[in-house]
């Protein structure tokens, strides 16, 4: 798997642990990854991408663009660190845990998961919880 991590902010991130999170999901889902680009950005970039691709004029925690087909996982995702920080406060959790939850969530989208329906959201949340437990034992 070729994983490119791009951090467009000044905030320090643990690239090795982020890579491990992506690999954990890919392996756990029994999938093969080709190329994945993970972009960690601020509100301005997130808002621009959200507006351009989803016609929503606000920053969001993550936007995923899957390119893979069949059993392959390929694509890119953008995670807004400003929104992650806000959500961590709102959900009474720490920044790192929320960052990894959303990273896992993004990779699940690349692997074909959807969260439009309540049962799909529940299924994704269960997978996220499982992978978070593996990462933070």
Curated annotation (Swiss-Prot):
Transmembrane segments: none annotated. It comes from the Bacteria. Keywords: Cytoplasm, Endonuclease, Hydrolase, Metal-binding, Nuclease, Ribosome biogenesis, rRNA processing, Zinc. One of its GO terms (cellular component) is cytoplasm. GO terms for biological process: rRNA processing. Its cofactor is Zn(2+). It is found in: Cytoplasm. Zn(2+) binds at residues 105, 109, 115. GO terms for molecular function: metalloendopeptidase activity; RNA endonuclease activity; zinc ion binding. Its EC number is 3.1.-.-. Binds 1 zinc ion. Pfam families: YbeY. NCBIfam families: rRNA maturation RNase YbeY (TIGR00043). Single strand-specific metallo-endoribonuclease involved in late-stage 70S ribosome quality control and in maturation of the 3' terminus of the 16S rRNA. Belongs to the endoribonuclease YbeY family. HAMAP family: Endoribonucl_YbeY (MF_00009). This is Endoribonuclease YbeY. The gene is ybeY.
């Amino acid at each position: 798997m070729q994983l490119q991590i791009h951090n467009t902010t000044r905030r320090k991130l643990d690239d090795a642990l982020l890579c491990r999170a992506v690999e954990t999901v890919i392996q756990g889902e029994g999938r093969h990854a080709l190329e994945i680009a993970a972009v960690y950005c601020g509100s301005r970039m997130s808002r621009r991408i959200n507006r351009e691709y989803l016609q929503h004029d606000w920053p969001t925690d993550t936007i995923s663009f899957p390119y893979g087909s069949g059993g392959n996982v390929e694509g890119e995702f953008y995670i807004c660190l400003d929104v992650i920080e806000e959500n961590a406060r709102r959900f009474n959790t720490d920044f790192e845990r929320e960052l990894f939850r959303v990273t896992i969530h993004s990779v699940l989208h690349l692997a074909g998961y959807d969260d439009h329906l309540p049962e799909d959201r529940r299924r994704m949340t269960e997978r996220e919880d499982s992978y978070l437990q593996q990462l933070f034992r």
